[in-house]
Amino acid sequence: MLDAKTIEVVKSTVPALREHGLTITTTFYKNMFEKNPEIKPFFNMAKQESGAQPKALAMTVLAAAENIENLGKLMPAVEKIAKVHCDCKVVPEQYPIIGKHLLEAIKEVLGDAATDEILDAWGKAYGVIADIFIEAEKKEYASRG
């Protein structure tokens, strides 16, 4: 789990995520697809083009920040997203790529406001959140046989 300081720092980013979340996730997808084109087939490009996917991710990141001290509250949403991830054949090895580009997008969009402390806290938080998704996806894959 996350220490109290990490939780405090992540929660402190909620206002920035409310204001800039969609820009962060739009930047994230653009950069990730440019730098890691091999990951593109795992994503619904129609949802990318319509803006639905960046918006959904922005809302998920915001919800994670708002509930970082009790991520269990997000389990119904996590389980729903895990089903979609399994439909798309997402694998655990993709999570580090996602995390790298998410942190880079936070830095790119927020600039100097994305301090090392904030990026470190979000790196730790992302690791915990990724593990929650990986476990949910493992259960979903197992239930499918």
List PLM regions with ranges.
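Globin-like tetrapyrrole-binding proteins
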Residues: 1-145
